[in-house]
Amino acid sequence: MSGPRPVRAPRGTEPSALGWQQEAALRMLQNNLDPEVAEHPDKLVVYGGTGKAARDWRSFDAMVRTLRTLKQDETMLVQSGRPVGVMQTHEWAPRVLIANSNLVGDWANWEEFRRLEALGLTMYGQMTAGSWIYIGTQGILQGTYETFAAVAAKKFGGTLAGTITLTAGLGGMGGAQPLAVTMNDGVVICVDCDPRAIDRRIEHHYLDVKADSLDHALQLATEARDRRKPLSIGVLGNAAELVPQLLAMGAPIDIVTDQTSAHDPLAYLPTGIAFEDMADAAAKDPAGFTTRARESMARHVEAMVGFQDAGAEVFDYGNSIRGEAQLAGYDRAFAFPGFVPAYIRPLFCEGKGPFRWAALSGDPADIAKTDKAILDLFPENESLARWIKMAGERVHFQGLPARICWLGYGERDKAGERFNDMVASGELAAPIVIGRDHLDCGSVASPYRETEAMLDGSDAIADWPLLNAMVNVASGASWVSLHHGGGVGMGRSIHAGQVTVADGTPLAGEKIRRVLTNDPGMGVIRHVDAGYDIAESVAAERDVRVPMREGDEAHEGDAAHGSGAAREGDGV
């Protein structure tokens, strides 16, 4: 009988599948469920409250079995964590196509999703859980680091030294926050209701210390701030209680955000319920639990707004807590901005986003060599060099060794081709898997996060992630995914992902060049279409073809030369 057991990706240079593309998908699926990586591997939950890698253990076994026998001209189809077919395609086609959690508009809500999930018909794939490219907390670390660096540049003279940040949530995503703040030389208090999450972040060196109480946490924070010493402090408790308490205490907080699992009310602990009773309470009365969770979120957000009124820099970190608080009746829920319009969108306009890779060999030396390759490729990028150096020194690998760094249009393809050459020459022991978060410049429609406050009002236009998925299929990605609801919950986002394998072959090189050009290119054209000047400049400088812009240029040229004048070649 298929059921829970420890899962770990194979290491080494010998594939058990019929090709490295299939082997890569197999190893990354298994890596997502490695106990070092997944939050609740026995339940197939990788991160984000309920984000799963497979619908059930029987489906997991079927995917493993199928990937091992999949031919070089075949494609496995995965419907919400279950393999539903194998089709003959061709060598340029993806080996796996994945669709997770997608529901028709009027049915796209948590209640209907849970009804269908209970029937065994779907699963919640989050972003990289169901698309098999989660690499542990490092996966969000640089984005979090860059966000806090942007906060520092905006308000604190380029450093967080001498500041205290308050946040909550130390799960797979939120667990990046303490290290991201201390990398920017700041002090941070991190609240979580799960003692295991706090202990795990300390074990993985993302969190420095655990406070005995809220008063103790504040004492540690102020002492470190006064010495301008970086320090991250975990404190056990319910954010809906502790954040308002800190506000009432007049705590000297400079920055406030949140990464609890607010996107799913059943994953947010209401006040008055003990953490140990949370799962039973949610299962027994999901509607009542949801109401109580939203009421608690409203108090949490009200306190965040209170800190903003007191002068703190406050932002939503993309977990939909503002929307949930608004549903509970709090009318100032959107008084503070989301992190993308506040800090990240200029990077998106340049086609920049979270480029990540993993060493299928399992050898950390392969990542060290790729780190050096990145530094050699982009010697002028000082912030990238600082990140790679810090990551090499401070990031704990979870599962297969991996790295993330933000690269833009015209950079990702260079990195991918270099990695492929290194595999071909034998410098790397085994192929490299290259992917990204779905949180990227041109792959998401999410009005509460990535596409919040778009210049042209196109926040909810969902054509872009669909086009992104299709162009990655057409370009030769190894597997492509199209999900709904990741990050912010059902009905609030549609997003796509791609993974491409550098196996050292000339064919892989051709695929890499296309995928890693076209994928970030979608970010450039999406922001050109929305009217962003930065994106317009990038498109012009780097020869990104945008037909509507070409039409405008042609029209301007005609006007300049006289539209009625005969021109050479017109046949007149």
Curated annotation (Swiss-Prot):
How is this protein named in the record? Urocanate hydratase
Gene3D superfamilies of this UniProt entry?
Urocanase like domains (3.40.50.10730), Urocanase superfamily (3.40.1770.10)
Compositionally skewed regions (Basic and acidic residues) per UniProt: 550-559
- Which enzyme class, named as a word? lyase
Q: Keyword set for this entry?
A: Cytoplasm, Histidine metabolism, Lyase, NAD
Question: Where does it localize?
Answer: Cytoplasm
Superkingdom of origin: Bacteria
| Membership in a protein family | Belongs to the urocanase family.
Would the keyword Membrane be found if you checked this record's keyword annotation? Answer: no
What start and end residues bound the annotated signal peptide? none
User: Organism, per UniProt?
Assistant: Streptomyces coelicolor (strain ATCC BAA-471 / A3(2) / M145)
Tell me one Pfam family matched here. Answer: Urocanase_N
Q: Which Gene Ontology terms cover its molecular function?
A: urocanate hydratase activity
According to the record, the segments passing through the membrane are: none
A cellular-component GO term for this protein: cytoplasm
**Residues noted as binding NAD(+) in the record, renumbered to the chain:** 48-49, 126, 172-174, 192, 238-239, 259-263, 268-269, 317, 487
Q: Which cofactor does it need?
A: NAD(+)
One biological process term from GO is: L-histidine catabolic process
**What does the record note about the cofactor?**
Binds 1 NAD(+) per subunit.
